[in-house]
Amino acid sequence: MNSGKYVFSQILELVNRYEFEKIVKTHKGNYRVREFNCWNQFIQLFFGQLTNLNSLRDICLCLKAHNNKLYHLGIKNYVSHTTLSRANEKRDWQIFADFGYYLIELVRPLYKNSAVPNLSIENELFALDSTTISCSINLLIWAEGKYSRGAIKMHTLLD
């Protein structure tokens, strides 16, 4: 039986919550929020990143399976995937980008003397992006997609 702290909660202690809350305050990220604030959202997404989960549904199912351990992991409560999805949609992404830049600046001095390996790629490198563009169904009748909404799927190949 585990008698110590969980690894996730030990890693979470290294994250400076004060700096995170300062960034949230500048972007007014917790304005009109009751339960699921920016910190809880960050913790759940951080959990998903560290456990290599592929989707919000996977994150929520995994947390729901470990519901009795959430408090010890540092997670306030379990939320459904729709709540997490809406929070990702509505909250300003700049909060997490600024915090990411803060973390990068924090660890940059640790690697300033490290040599960057000379990376050579012999083959061509491509990036493929697939984006769905919503459009008015009244204007583009031929673009009717799921649920009677109009959309165009665009695939872009960058070299």
Model feature map: region roles:
Residues 1-159:
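Conserved, well-structured functional cores that handle cations and Mg-NTP chemistry
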